[in-house]
């Protein structure tokens, strides 16, 4: 025990567990009504099948369901794979026209034919050239 340096307004009571078999009535938790063992046994069977209707203090002899608190449950993040993102378009007309660079892919097919008696089985080569133009 620590030495007290002033007046102590709290009562010093020994801590006794509610389910202590050596103390029939703990200091701070006295049962409201005495029930027969048959009723207690019936309540234990019902507590496994019927959820409790209130979150108030229940008798300590009832078997309780393990209900984890929400802070201990992991909630996966929402997945938006099915939805495609729609870009936002500024609908306010501005006074100055803006130039947007556009990139177009131009394909040119070049077939190289040589004067040879062999048969060429390879497909013609395809070259892709990027052309960038600015539209005003």
From Swiss-Prot:
Cysteines paired by S-S bonds: none
Cellular location(s): Secreted
Keyword Phosphoprotein among record annotations: yes
Keywords: Glycoprotein, Milk protein, Phosphoprotein, Secreted
UniProt-listed GO biological process terms: lactation; protein stabilization
Protein family (similarity comment): Belongs to the kappa-casein family.
Name the UniProt record assigns to this protein: Kappa-casein
Organism per entry: Bison bonasus
């Amino acid at each position: 025990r620590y030495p007290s340096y002033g007046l102590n307004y709290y009562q010093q009571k020994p801590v006794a567990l509610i389910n202590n078999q050596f103390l029939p009535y703990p200091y701070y938790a006295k049962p409201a009504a005495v029930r027969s063992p048959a009723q207690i046994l019936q309540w234990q069977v019902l507590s496994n099948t019927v959820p409790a209707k209130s979150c108030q203090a229940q008798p300590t002899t009832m078997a309780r369901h393990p209900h984890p608190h929400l802070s201990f449950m992991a909630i996966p993040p929402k997945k938006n794979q099915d939805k495609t993102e729609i870009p936002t378009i500024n609908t306010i007309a501005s006074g100055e026209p803006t130039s947007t660079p556009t990139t177009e892919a131009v394909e040119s097919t070049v077939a190289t034919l040589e004067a040879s008696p062999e048969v060429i089985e390879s497909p013609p080569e395809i070259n892709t050239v990027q052309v960038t133009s600015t539209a005003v």
